[in-house]
Amino acid sequence: MPITKDEIIKALEEMKLNELNELVKAIEDHFGVVASVGVAAAAPAEATNAAPTEVSVVMTSVGQQKVAVIKVVKELTGVGLMDAKKMVDGAMPVTIKEHVKPEEAEEMKAKLVEAGASIDLK
């Protein structure tokens, strides 16, 4: 019996960020394609006034407590320690998590700010 879309989505939801990155690279190599973000059409004027339903948590600077920030990034993203360190040590700004509900994003921001990072929600 073939795998259903729902089973694939469920499996993807359980994967860690680094595993998803490896999967995307494997798909690109196997099918000879490049994963790129498409440009969306302009939203109607009335929709732009509504509060966003999803936001991205973006770190703009690490601050003095780099180790504390790495621990929080690891906790929030579910990635391994080395991947969290790479995110924190990399070029800023860096997106910590995308497509997050605004309430969850505020909680993430509070934890990261408490650890010493500067965060923007976009």
From Swiss-Prot:
Keyword flag Ribonucleoprotein: yes
Top-rank taxon: Bacteria
Gene3D superfamilies (alphabetical): 3.30.1390.10, Single helix bin
InterPro entries registered for this protein in UniProt: Ribosomal_bL12, Ribosomal_bL12_C, Ribosomal_bL12_C/ClpS-like, Ribosomal_bL12_oligo, Ribosomal_bL12_oligo_N_sf
Keyword entries, A-Z: Ribonucleoprotein, Ribosomal protein
Coiled coil: none
Biological processes annotated in GO: translation
Any single GO CC term annotated in Swiss-Prot or TrEMBL for this entry: cytosolic large ribosomal subunit
Molecular function terms, GO-annotated: mRNA binding; structural constituent of ribosome
Stated family: Belongs to the bacterial ribosomal protein bL12 family.
Complexes and interactors: Homodimer. Part of the ribosomal stalk of the 50S ribosomal subunit. Forms a multimeric L10(L12)X complex, where L10 forms an elongated spine to which 2 to 4 L12 dimers bind in a sequential fashion. Binds GTP-bound translation factors.
UniProt function note: Forms part of the ribosomal stalk which helps the ribosome interact with GTP-bound translation factors. Is thus essential for accurate translation.
Annotated protein name in UniProt: Large ribosomal subunit protein bL12
Gene: rplL
